[in-house]
Regions:
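Conserved nucleotide- and phosphate/pyrophosphate-binding catalytic cores
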Residues: 208-352
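NTP-dependent nucleotidyl-transfer catalytic core
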Residues: 1-198, 202-206, 213-218, 231
Length: 352
């Protein structure tokens, strides 16, 4: 594990947030010497964000907690195209009305985690929808190498599988690169952060700013949210696990009790420590002790994780506690379990 001089990079590294940094020594020096502005982009493909975005939101929160300035970039314009990064097929093209409604919905997610008065929430429609196509091709497109774009995993994997990649999607990384350039020009933003699948798009923005303005910008990516066995976290047979609870009838909503059960049931034993580092503020010394637990004892660690992350997302006052699934060990079931013991074991009680 790398040791960083800056408090911010050292902290997020210890908690497992760092996958790649474009120039770690220079960025570490900047974080040590000054307050910087960084951004993460979120597309508006749904009126809610799922747990795959939680790591990015918490990264912005940590940036804010360490006194730096986070920017949330809403992809009001790029959502009309769709990001092809590590996707097997083209995204469904949404109507403009759906995208506008989605923008309103996901802004509510950020309000739960971030101090809205101390961050900037910017929609890239502000500049992308004003572009003249011919001028954009001449002034921006001329700085992009198709040869290099074809080498990025987000494109290469689709082509290797002989899956269609539309010209519309191929333009996505150019627009995202331009986003980074504009945020640097208008807001002095020097760092783009995102999941590891965004590396190619981030590099495009770094290269563009160097060519257009001679500026040195930086990129930082996080690992994708996967289990030790390589399974992506965030979806079930019923659909995605969403961060905002809207209603049980809403297709883009997950009830807090189902949210708790998801983390309790889907977390693999080897991942309890990793997820506690990412999604809680528990001291590392306590997490190390939990990681030592084996076999059935680690199940208590899974329940602790489920509780901590549900309280983070839905609050301690949500009704998930009274509706979580009753869980007890197989050997306890085989030897028999009294009703009162069962209720006590699961923090339930009888009304008088």
């Amino acid at each position: 594990m790398n040791n960083y001089k800056s408090d911010f990079l050292n902290h997020i590294n210890e908690r497992g947030f760092i996958y790649q940094i474009s120039d770690s020594d220079k960025l570490d020096k900047l974080f040590s010497e000054e307050k910087i502005t960084a951004y993460i982009g979120f597309d508006c493909t749904a009126p809610n964000l799922h747990i795959g975005s939680l790591m990015q939101i918490l990264l912005l929160k940590k940036l804010q907690d360490f006194g730096h300035t986070p920017i949330v970039l809403i992809g009001g314009a790029t959502s009309k195209i769709g990001d092809p990064s590590l996707k097997d097929k083209s995204r469904k093209i949404l109507s403009y009305e759906d995208i506008n409604n989605n923008v309103k919905g996901i802004k509510k997610v950020f309000e739960k985690f971030l101090d809205i008065n101390k961050i900037k929430i910017i929609d890239n429609s502000k500049w992308l929808e004003e572009l003249n196509y011919i001028d954009f091709l001449r002034e921006i497109g001329s700085h992009f190498s198709v040869n290099r774009m074809l080498s990025f995993d987000s494109v290469k994997q689709r082509l290797e599988r002989e899956q269609n990649l539309s010209f519309l999607e191929f333009n996505y990384m150019i627009l995202q690169g331009y986003d980074f350039y504009k945020l640097n020009t208008d807001y002095n933003c020097i760092l783009q952060m995102g999941g590891s699948d965004q590396w190619g798009n981030i590099i495009c923005g770094i290269d563009l700013s160097r060519r257009l303005a001679g500026k040195e910008l930086f990129g930082l990516t996080t690992p994708l949210l996967t289990t030790s066995s390589g399974q992506k976290m965030g979806k079930t047979e019923e659909g995605a696990i969403w961060l905002n609870f809207i209603s049980e009838k809403d297709n883009h909503s997950t009830h807090p009790r189902d949210f708790w059960n998801y983390w309790r049931d889907k977390t693999e034993s080897d991942d309890v420590g990793k997820f506690l580092r990412l999604f809680t503020d528990m001291p590392l010394s306590e997490i190390y002790e939990i990681e030592k637990l084996k076999n059935e004892d680690i199940e208590k660690g899974k329940e602790l994780l489920a509780t901590k992350i549900t309280e983070l997302v839905h609050g301690k006052d949500s009704d998930w506690k009274s509706k979580k699934r009753i869980v007890f060990k197989k050997k306890e079931f085989e030897k028999g379990y009294g009703l009162l013991s069962l209720l006590s074991h699961n923090d339930l009680g009888l009304a008088k």
